[in-house]
Amino acid sequence: MPGPWLLLALALIFTLTGIPESCALPEAAQEEGAVTPDLPGLENVQVRPERRFLWKDLQRVRGDLGAALDSWITKRQHPGKREEEEKDIEAEERGDLGEGGAWRLHKRQHPGRRANQDKYSWADEEDSDWMPRSWLPDFFLDSWFSDVPQVKRQHPGRRSFPWMESDVTKRQHPGRRFIDPELQRSWEEKEGEGVLMPEKRQHPGKRALGHPCGPQGTCGQTGLLQLLGDLSRGQETLVKQSPQVEPWDKEPLEE
């Protein structure tokens, strides 16, 4: 860029030509002042054009630097919102602009929530090698797209299937998972009553079956008394069946 170098050269020339003459030849300047008459405003007339030239050079240099900075600095954009200037220029030249007189910005979406705004977008491309829209009738496209359901991406543990009755299935513990509603019926259901008896999953070492204080028993005073009575009767039967003293031990032996 010749602007700044030219400005520096002019400033250097002015300093070299003005300062040494005033310092080295003071007597010659006094003689010239004595010979020539005093003209008021002559120095100002010489200084003003110099300032104007310098000001013009500075403005030109600033303009060149500003244009260079604008071309050097580029704003970094998001990959999903990046504008393609070449396509805009080509569209302006051809006159093929999108809705609103400009290209529509495509927003980057989540892969599981990506929505096809135009269901025939893949068939609108005439240059595609697969199957252009001109080969397919409208009724075929309508029937084909109506058969394809719009499936929403769900969590693997909460994914619902069409063969299940409930639309949303909650992921459950492996020991409490019920796939079929019939499996939820406990084996304790009575045939005539039709009352569901929920079964609680217990620890294998703490599982109690038939205990008087269990789900089917009562832990009241009557239940405890009955339990104590059963235990006492069991001990009496054991004593009667196995006496400690046999009857032939009591009879004396005959000589």
Swiss-Prot record:
Q: Residue ranges under compositional bias (Polar residues)? A: 235-244
Record region (Disordered): 76-102, 184-214, 235-255
Q: Can you quote a single GO CC term?
A: extracellular region
Positions of post-translational Proline amide modification: 79, 111, 156, 174, 204
Q: What does this protein do?
A: Functions as a regulator of the biosynthesis of TSH in the anterior pituitary gland and as a neurotransmitter/ neuromodulator in the central and peripheral nervous systems.
What family is this protein classified in? Belongs to the TRH family.
Its annotated compartments are: Secreted
The question of whether Transmembrane is a record keyword is answered with: no
Q: What processes in GO biological process is this protein linked to?
A: adult walking behavior; eating behavior; histamine metabolic process; hormone-mediated signaling pathway; negative regulation of feeding behavior; negative regulation of glutamate secretion; positive regulation of gamma-aminobutyric acid secretion; positive regulation of insulin secretion
Question: Do you know which Pfam families this protein is assigned to?
Answer: TRH
Q: Which residues form the signal peptide?
A: 1-24
Q: Basic and acidic residues bias: where?
A: 184-202
List the gene name: Trh
- One of the record's GO molecular function terms: thyrotropin-releasing hormone activity
Q: Which UniProt keywords apply?
A: Amidation, Cleavage on pair of basic residues, Hormone, Pyrrolidone carboxylic acid, Repeat, Secreted, Signal
Residues with the modification Pyrrolidone carboxylic acid, per the entry, are 154, 172
**By what name is this protein known?**
Pro-thyrotropin-releasing hormone
Secreted as UniProt keyword: yes
